[in-house]
A protein has these predicted regions:
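Selective transmembrane helix interface/packing segments
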Residues: 2-279
Length: 279
């Protein structure tokens, strides 16, 4: 029996093999998220992959859209200007001003807007035909975005405390007994320098990875049952799996927006902690 053919718009590594070949259907896994497009050294670290290409495309699209929409501003906005103003006002007012505070938020709006739009566009690419890959499902990309947030966070906190040493001292609340201070300092250090960055990056990565894997399972599994199933029940199950994947796609779109919003919201929360006098 011939192998099941997976659409070229899906990950090519996720292939259902022929019965009696390599064991039948192979469930999509984490390995399907590594696909060297231009492997300079085989499949090494310097290979240009689909996530890298999609990320560059997203940056180009965002730059083209924002520059084009704001080149000729009018009192009555065009559709593109309306979308730009809407996204800016959403991030500025809902995230920046409401979370960081009206005194300090404006200087951080460009960072927050960049984070929100970049993450959102790259997440939505997960359901765009012929791309269908959420780049945030590659853990290195959320980690880089998190590092940017935390460089800003700690830089602002150190400036507010007028130095590195006063900043570290501020991690310990006043009035504690001497024996408790090293313990609490260790816990606070882990929280601000390890746990918070890890959870911020891994939350985005995990949701995008799990959501895309789920869609792959339903679509590729449905295709296998529909084409390779040897009875009507399996064929019907395959068709049902395809239908369910359509509903899952709309649900995934909601998750993609929420993850972009949550990442940006948490970044604003951490920055607000840095600018706070009580930090």
């Amino acid at each position: 029996m011939s192998p099941t053919v997976v659409s070229a718009s899906w990950l090519p590594a996720a292939v259902a093999t022929a019965e009696g070949g390599e064991g039948g259907f192979q469930t999509p896994g984490v390995a399907d998220f590594w696909w060297p497009v231009i492997p300079f050294d085989g499949t090494g670290a310097w290979a240009i992959t689909r996530p890298a290409i999609v990320l560059l495309i997203s940056v180009g699209l965002l730059a083209w859209f924002y520059v084009g929409a704001t080149r000729k501003l009018t009192v009555v906005p065009s559709k593109s200007q309306f979308m730009v103003e809407g996204s800016y006002n959403f991030v500025r007012n809902t995230i920046g001003r409401d979370i960081i505070g009206s005194k300090d938020f404006l200087q951080f709006v460009p960072l927050l807007l960049t984070l929100f739009t970049l993450i959102l566009v790259n997440n939505v690419f997960g359901i765009v035909p012929f791309i269908q890959f959420p780049t945030m499902s590659r853990v290195g990309i959320p980690i880089v975005l998190t590092l940017i947030v935390y460089v800003v966070y700690h830089t602002v906190a150190i400036r507010r405390k007028h130095g590195v040493l006063p900043y570290f001292k501020s991690l310990i609340p006043p009035g504690l007994p001497g024996w408790l201070k090293p313990i609490l300092f260790g816990l606070e250090f882990l929280t601000y320098f390890v746990i918070r960055p890890l959870t911020l990056a891994l939350r985005l990565f995990g949701n995008m990875l799990a959501g895309h894997l789920m869609l792959l399972v339903f679509i590729i599994g449905g295709e296998y049952l529909l084409l390779e199933g040897d009875n009507l029940f399996l064929n019907f199950s395959g068709a049902l799996s395809f239908a369910f994947s359509i509903g899952m796609t709309f649900f995934e779109l909601l998750i993609e927006f929420l993850q972009a919003f949550i990442f940006t919201l948490l970044a604003a929360l951490y920055i607000s902690d840095a600018v706070s006098e009580h930090h």
